[in-house]
């Protein structure tokens, strides 16, 4: 007989009590709360547990042997330890007892055992009142039998057992605490029962079974006093004893009453916590049971509020009541009464359903989740829930059942259930099947119900294309083994067992059938909304019902969890029996390997692959049968779901049923395309499209940008158009999540107009397929139309609009109508339509004169939107017009003939189509009307106008680049077209050139011209002009160079023919003209064809000059000529090679195409002096970009798994057009934060050094009185804009010292807190280099100083506050600054003014005008860089005097005094300098580069072959648009900033040979393509290989009386994008290179001479400033020189003929340069190109040339 253990119960342990409650059997004639009977054995167990030093064995048990008691604990179980009582007071026969005392007259009944002695036991004294047993009772008491019907035996029954075996009675433990009294009473009652005094114990009603005798009362009183000391009694016990100290019976009665009450409360709490309800019992009974429990607990002082009660009730709901958990859990103020109203409603609905449909009545036992037993007459299912107990509860398997054949009788009763035979299954966990559930309709599902599944319901799925069900109970007309392939969301195949019909019987008594697939391998029964829609049933989630299109409600929808469900009670059952699919778990499966274990072991492969591998023995050691495959089908690996997650498959047509309710023009789709690059500013770069969901009518609008106001204007326009034209209001607009749609301006506009924006979901671009497919279609049409017509790309939107007009009139295969017909508009009249690009002649209604031709050739674009005319493009006027005054040009020489349009376009058919339209025009034409020929103000193309050109007789006609393709010629049958002299009425767009105006046959970049033909007004005539054919651009660099070399070697093609000349047909716009072009010499050809401008000077070409450096012979004196020779004499120029290469004129330098796919911004440089080509036009030919309209994005790189979804890429384009030089390079962060240096620094030694530096910095700040230490301010009291954040930064210097600096966050300083006019000045690098050079030549001493905490010497005027250092622990306080703290905007300027004033007033220095931070007096020169000072003087004592003066005011530290005559090493502003006074100076950065470059994470090759040059000629930077996701783009830009930042720092310090490469790559920082990164890596690799190189200076000859300052300049003409030229300058002082500059010219030069002039003019200002500095620092005379390798430039500078400048648009710059040269006494000298060391600044050079030009000054 099971019983609860009362000794373990306490009021504060309800949770454990609830968890350990088991079912009990109680005799019907016994009170279950009767402590005197049913709890006696538990009291004994509690007493046993209380004895911490005592074990109980069968031989020494204190309980008399009785077969009705619980079985003793096995010997293997260890004895109880550490009970609640610390001692046992055992009375034994060996103790000396007082006379007359006996334990009920039988002291021998307690045998002595050694382990029963307690060290705390003491024998009672004689004065102790021991219990006396009455003389009338002389036999021991025995335990009553449960069969007696009474819990306790009376005296007579005790007498009958006097002869029983002697047993000792264990006394109760000693009471040691008032809190232990309830447990002690239980053991005390047990003691009385074992002493045969159970009859005197009060029962439930408080009265004993028999009267207590006086002797028993004495015994009771004495034992209570002995084992319950008064100091440990509870208060209520003491109160009873204070009234009557002998009333022990009242204490026992009260204790039993309390125990009964506590037990009842515990049982109620346990019952309430384990409520179970599934509708199997009436709802009224369930409500009565729950309310009684709650009322009883409230009456006993345990208050259960509504929230807790509702949670407990809902937790126990199952079956169809389970969904109340999710529908009610959000109601915060729900009451128990409201919850039971819902339960009653569901119960009544169930009963009504069962009564109305007896054939589909679910067995009541299906949902008995609270049933714990199952009776099966044939073969019961035994499930071991506890090793010591068995339970006949029935479970369900996790993934498998043996489904028995169901007869599906109209009524299902318990008899039919008991007859079903099933195999034993094992219960895996408590969440499997509902306990007590039978194998009826609901259990044929061969998978578990998921935790979020609503049993007995179908899941509504809008993404599923087919309905799938796990049960065969509802499949009608099933056919097995269907050939159907079904995949799930992870694209895994789902095996299908059968296909059939699913029949519904809805509320309106209508029946509907859909197709259904049977499979046990799914987690839910899925009902496809697509299949329901096919039978005119839709789901309305607003009303949560299934309904027909006419609004008839069929069934309710239940929202359970995150899904929507429909009850299965609307399904009609069938009589089909499907065979078992999955095997039932047997005991054998426990010996197999679980599939999840194998799945994880084999790298998370799928089950199909693993099984196939095991079958084919590719995996050894175990076989397929060794794996438990029962859970393989439905097993969902959480790691696989995360690691292999894919985008949801967008189901085509899944949205249509939700949009059918919209009327025309109420639901729009929109998307934006763009930008299209390389277009004139007047042409649109974007377009926005709109598509109506219902009619599929389309609109397109041009856009020049994607600004908010531009988008808003378009939305305003189309909404007004739809409202006025179609009397409709737009309700919803679907769009993507681009910033142009998600901005606040548009959102407010839509909200104001009551329009709902519908955005696409993340990573589901296919949901926006309507708009994106339209854009793709229009772009395909655009490319095709432009290719077909040959029109320039800036007319791309006209092609888009033409396509939109046509496609709105084409019928859809689905709707059988066109979009225009759906919209109620008229169809397209094809008689008014012309092919896109059709050549036409437009009437000129306003000619220049009456004899001027009245026809202008043009190309038809599309019908006008604003008139009945046509939009026609006029190339000659560079604009479009809206007119009806045109005639179709039917000549065979039109552009449309290039693709053999003889077979595609027929003039007769075109005439027949347009005959009616033109007859209509002719009949209504007004002769003098000009209205129809006026430009349309609404057509954007009318704003496109181009450069006006001079009237020309020659229009180059492009031909095929291959020699095998003969040029097209016109036969005699060709109809002549009169020549038209055109005018340009207004200024034109500068971005459009001729090649982008007229149609071209092939979109070749630089076509090779083999012959030129043209029609003239007087017939055919050939001209013998030695044209230089431009080379076709090859796909590879090698072929390109080969082509150039080959064409150049054929010099005979460039020779002139003085006596014979042929007639070359020249292309014209119309007519023929027999004109003989006169003979043209080579020089004239060069002027006309190549330069198209006369040369300013007649100087000989450079390739005919001598290889020696020859100054220009001018009418100067001999001394001046000697000066020019002396300028060149000491320069570090290379020695000339024995056989110099032949150079050609600068005129032959190639002009690269502007839109080439390979930009001429390269490390190879197309502007190389060794690369030559020619052009055949006065204006440069601009190449059409073949991929301007290209919008397809590359496939996402599958290796890039940094994101779980394909990244949203952005197109990156070159931004180098606006970049002139390296600017704002982001520096490399070499400092550490506080957490990096101290908090999380694992290097203990380094951490200690940083802590030491930290305290040193704080002490220095306090010493300098940086802030006011007298008061700390509360943050709330200070204006927030005057509060500056602060932080600590840590750094390790190259000398190994660790430094800490407490700085203010000046980067976020408010502008009102400092004077923006103040500047922080530092010494210019050119000033430092000049000072160092003069020091070497004059044997100066160089002293290096450092002023500690320099900024803190400057006071601060403004009222500013910062946060205290962290160690002070005052986070909410502020301190006021008194000094110019580090990091503040004004600190640098304040320090500069402070130290400047001190040097001038106290040290007697003066600042050099124009060169801040350079101070001098008669003996000393000082260069100041913040807190670093460099002193130069002839006398070291002069330096020491300055140092002494500085130390009076500042903490000055001498870094290097420089007094040694040996080599001295300095580290001055990053430069590592080796200086031996009077001999040499070497400047480098080897140590710094050795430390910094490896930290850049550049793939260096330290042991490989070293690079000999930073780049090679012929390497082009690809200009393809770069598509890259945002994170990777930022990462690469940051990497480029670090690499170019370091390279720029080194290059401008001393590595001037790298400046061209640095400048070129710096222009591509925002375009970090793979090619750009590789070139950058190559530059860094070269810096690493040559990190030991130094800038070498030697002392100037002492015989030189003057200082010589020289600037060598060079320019590379047109080798940068957009024909910009690269210019470079190198500055030398007394033969020592002190600086260099390489940059892109700010202006576009038109010739090599102009580029050279630009380069020289850029060098003159700095040359003059340096001259002033040198003269200030050294009083010697100075000679200034300019060296260039362009004789034509020198000729211009020294020329006195001003007439040559009047016709040159660069004449102003040339005149200014001439004036500067003359006014500043500059000597302009010529230097050969092979000796021009500035050549390294303008272009990449071959290795040999690069070494030759640099090895004299840097090595």
Curated annotation (Swiss-Prot):
Q: Which cysteines are joined by disulfide bonds?
A: none
User: What positions does the domain Reverse transcriptase Ty1/copia-type occupy?
Assistant: 1338-1476
Specify residue ranges for compositional bias: Basic and acidic residues.
1038-1052
- InterPro entries recorded: Aspartic_peptidase_AS, DNA/RNA_pol_sf, Integrase_cat-core, Retrotran_Ty1/copia-like, RNaseH-like_sf, RNaseH_sf, RVT_2, TYA
Q: Which reaction does it catalyse?
A: DNA(n) + a 2'-deoxyribonucleoside 5'-triphosphate = DNA(n+1) + diphosphate; Endonucleolytic cleavage to 5'-phosphomonoester
Compartments in which it is found: Cytoplasm; Nucleus
Residues with site note (Cleavage): 401-402, 582-583, 1217-1218
Alphabetized, the UniProt keywords read:
Aspartyl protease, ATP-binding, Cytoplasm, DNA integration, DNA recombination, DNA-binding, DNA-directed DNA polymerase, Endonuclease, Hydrolase, Magnesium, Metal-binding, Multifunctional enzyme, Nuclease, Nucleotide-binding, Nucleotidyltransferase, Nucleus, Phosphoprotein, Protease, RNA-binding, RNA-directed DNA polymerase, Transferase, Transposable element, Transposition, Viral release from host cell, Virion maturation, Zinc, Zinc-finger
Q: Provide the residue span(s) of the region labelled Integrase-type zinc finger-like.
A: 583-640
Q: Where is this region: Disordered?
A: 1-93, 126-173, 352-421, 956-1087, 1092-1111, 1129-1172
The record comments on the domains as follows: The C-terminal RNA-binding region of CA is sufficient for all its nucleocapsid-like chaperone activities.
- Function description: Capsid protein (CA) is the structural component of the virus-like particle (VLP), forming the shell that encapsulates the retrotransposons dimeric RNA genome. The particles are assembled from trimer-clustered units and there are holes in the capsid shells that allow for the diffusion of macromolecules. CA also has nucleocapsid-like chaperone activity, promoting primer tRNA(i)-Met annealing to the multipartite primer-binding site (PBS), dimerization of Ty1 RNA and initiation of reverse transcription. The aspartyl protease (PR) mediates the proteolytic cleavages of the Gag and Gag-Pol polyproteins after assembly of the VLP.
Relate the assembly described in the record.
The capsid protein forms a homotrimer, from which the VLPs are assembled. The protease is a homodimer, whose active site consists of two apposed aspartic acid residues.
Name by which UniProt lists this protein: Transposon Ty1-PR3 Gag-Pol polyprotein
Q: Which organism is it from?
A: Saccharomyces cerevisiae (strain ATCC 204508 / S288c) (Baker's yeast)
